[in-house]
């Protein structure tokens, strides 16, 4: 427990401000800034502030919020609103000019508008409205979300993906470059507009290259009226400031680590972790930057929304000192409440927990740490409101101070998902309610069966660099290996235009042929030839598929697989027995599933619902997917270096006549390859030619 707390004494043993002075206070008299220069004048009355998660708006009433046009409001009795956000994406820097004397210990300068402190290490970043994380979107179900994305980055196109939102009415707003839209070029603006549904905890992030890890992400929360929230009886408060984004952080731009280094700084691991964009490095030489505080009251129960905003392969452990975590939702869907000591968070995960603040008023550590060989931590503070004066800080915890205990989603310690083990798998958890159509989702015989096997392809130097074929294939140097990544022995290549919104056929030589035995049976890997193509699997609209995600690779990586456009119902998770042939195991597993299918609605009536499913090394997950959302939907590993080197594919759900058409004027793009006529320029008289 933290006793006699004062933040800066933690490292410097000098007088400092009370932590109470650092915290934002809810202010019900706020007025929103209208007529902002960055906003569309026609929408200025709908503009939302950048600091929703600051605590300033936590206690505002529905009536007061709607009076000033604030979309972050209690949703009981709320009228649908237009919620407009104007975002400028630009090259920026941590502890830059806006921070003044922050690094010299002036905490008021650290809190200046435009000051991004991160962990106090100065580095270039990418930012949304000069914030990390980017502005939080918090609205009520049924609102209309409008986001103008202005790309002011010097050398980068971009898109924004709304992670976990189905986009049923607006598939062209999913934000995947060259799949659902053209990238947003530098100097242009793209308007995302979609209905706020379903309710739950989501987040937004760039889906272009490695930009997400350099700062382009933020929270997105859609609430329903409390009277309609089936898990609201578990908590007293669901505050806008109690949204937590966990991120891994490098001290250089992420693309400086791609495709990898051979001689210096070769690791693709984080240098730090951030909690809501902040951390204070535990070193005598560390800069004087603040950490994040979350304010609570004794004997109250608070809903916290935890977002796995990390990008790299190392999972994060989340814990709150002396406070168990009551899990009530995952990836936006309620679950039967259960208690754990820690959360194991993978990239893309979201977990809602209730913290019962029943301790004596004080301050308690919130910690995130990696589970990899080099343990890196970030700390924040759970601060009880109290009349006592806060003075000094106690010892900061090291990486082993808090035991892991019973941990949710701990695929590293319980990959077989055995019962009675401290590692709890999602397949062992029940959703709060059965599927809306249990006889469809859990039908005895699925309409389709797919196996999605993830693996890596190891290049030889000769094949990649010296073989005289003038091919330039993507690779990632995971020193000493040089690899790319695959699903079903196919390394994904982006199409030359977005197939969702442009009906031109993709060139046949770019599409993975479904009957290509050289890709399907794996002989291409053994022979050293890579299948690199646009991998699309077609599914009938309304079909229910049984999908087996399985790791056929030889690495020690865990793969958080994310599906756009719909959810997965987790039926089973486990580990492939050692020494068993991959195909033989798949056949055994499918035979078992077929045998048990007749009773699935009885034996597994409330499967957990998620859009991110993590596969451990040599592990698997069996899921049911109801493909009821027409369009082109990405499925990919959320480890950023894996997805960007081929561990992706597309589900085409339905046919073009079943697709929802994009709005008029929707941007188009394609390769430009005009015909070449040898005589085209012969008739031109050049100024430098003799007459």
Pin down the residues of each PLM region.
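Surface-exposed loops/turns
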Residues: 139-141, 186, 198-199, 298, ...
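Aromatic/His-enriched, Gly/Pro-containing loop or helix-boundary segments
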Residues: 123-138, 168-202, 230-231, 339-344
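Cleavable N-terminal signal peptides of Sec/SRP-targeted secreted and luminal proteins
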Residues: 2-19
């Amino acid at each position: 427990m933290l006793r006699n707390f004062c933040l800066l004494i933690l490292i410097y043993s000098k007088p400092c401000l009370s932590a109470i002075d650092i915290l934002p206070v809810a202010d019900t008299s706020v007025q929103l800034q209208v007529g902002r220069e960055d906003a569309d004048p026609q929408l200025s009355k709908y503009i939302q502030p950048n600091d929703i998660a600051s605590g300033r708006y936590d206690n505002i009433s529905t009536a007061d919020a709607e009076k000033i046009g604030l979309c972050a409001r209690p949703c009981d009795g709320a009228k649908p609103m237009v919620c407009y956000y104007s975002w400028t994406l630009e090259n920026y820097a941590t502890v830059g000019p806006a921070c003044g004397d922050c690094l010299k210990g002036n905490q008021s300068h650290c809190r200046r508008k435009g000051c991004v402190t991160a962990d106090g290490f100065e580095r270039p970043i990418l930012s949304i409205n000069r914030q990390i994380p980017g502005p939080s979107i918090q609205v009520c179900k049924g609102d209309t979300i409008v986001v103008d994305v202005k790309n002011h980055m010097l050398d980068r196109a971009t898109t924004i993906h709304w992670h976990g939102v189905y986009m049923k009415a607006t598939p062209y707003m999913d934000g995947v470059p060259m799949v659902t839209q053209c990238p947003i070029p530098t100097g242009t603006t793209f308007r995302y507009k979609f209905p706020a549904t379903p309710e739950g905890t989501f987040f937004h992030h760039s889906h272009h290259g490695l930009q997400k890890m350099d700062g382009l992400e933020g929270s997105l929360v859609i609430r329903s009226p409390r009277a309609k929230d089936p898990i609201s009886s578990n908590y007293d408060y669901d505050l806008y400031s109690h949204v937590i984004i966990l991120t891994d952080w490098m001290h250089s731009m992420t693309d400086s680590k791609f495709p990898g280094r051979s001689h210096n700084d070769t690791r693709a691991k984080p240098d730090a972790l951030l909690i809501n964009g902040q951390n204070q490095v535990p070193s005598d030489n560390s800069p004087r930057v603040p950490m994040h505080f979350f304010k609570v009251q004794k004997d109250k129960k608070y809903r916290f929304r935890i977002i796995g905003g990390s990008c790299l392969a190392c999972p994060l452990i989340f814990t709150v000192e002396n406070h168990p975590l009551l899990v009530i939702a995952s990836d936006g869907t309620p679950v039967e409440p259960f208690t754990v000591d820690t959360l194991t968070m993978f990239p893309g995960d979201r977990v809602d927990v209730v913290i019962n603040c029943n301790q004596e008023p004080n301050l308690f550590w919130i910690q995130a740490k990696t589970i990899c060989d080099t343990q890196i931590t970030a700390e924040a503070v759970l601060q009880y409101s109290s009349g006592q004066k806060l003075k000094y800080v106690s010892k900061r915890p090291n990486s082993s101070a808090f035991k892991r205990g019973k941990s949710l989603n701990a695929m590293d310690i319980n990959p077989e998902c055995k019962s009675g083990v401290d590692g709890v798998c999602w397949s062992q958890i029940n959703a709060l309610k059965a599927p809306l159509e249990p006889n469809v989702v859990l039908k005895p015989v699925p309409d389709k069966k797919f196996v999605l096997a993830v693996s890596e392809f190891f290049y030889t130097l000769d094949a990649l660099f010296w073989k005289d074929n003038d091919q330039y294939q993507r690779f990632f140097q995971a020193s000493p290996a040089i690899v790319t990544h695959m699903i079903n022995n196919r390394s994904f290549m982006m199409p030359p235009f977005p197939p969702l919104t442009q009906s031109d056929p993709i060139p046949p030589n770019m599409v993975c042929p479904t009957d290509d035995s050289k890709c399907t049976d794996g002989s291409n890997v053994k022979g050293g030839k890579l299948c690199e193509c646009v991998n699309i699997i077609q599914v009938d609209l309304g079909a229910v598929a049984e999908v087996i995600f399985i790791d056929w690779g030889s690495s020690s990586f865990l793969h958080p697989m994310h599906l756009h456009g719909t959810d997965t119902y987790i039926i089973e998770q486990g580990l492939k027995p050692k020494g068993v042939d991959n195909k033989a195991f798949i056949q055994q597993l499918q035979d078992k599933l077929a045998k048990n299918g007749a009773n699935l609605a009885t034996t597994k009536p409330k499967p957990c619902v998620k859009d991110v499913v993590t596969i451990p090394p040599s592990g698997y997950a069996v899921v049911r997917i109801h493909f009821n959302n027409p369009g082109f939907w990405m499925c990919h590993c959320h480890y950023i270096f894996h997805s960007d080197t081929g561990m992706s594919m597309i589900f085409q759900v339905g046919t073009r006549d079943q697709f929802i058409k994009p709005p008029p004027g929707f941007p188009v793009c394609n390769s430009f390859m005009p015909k070449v006529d040898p005589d085209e320029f012969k008739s031109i008289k050049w100024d430098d030619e003799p007459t």
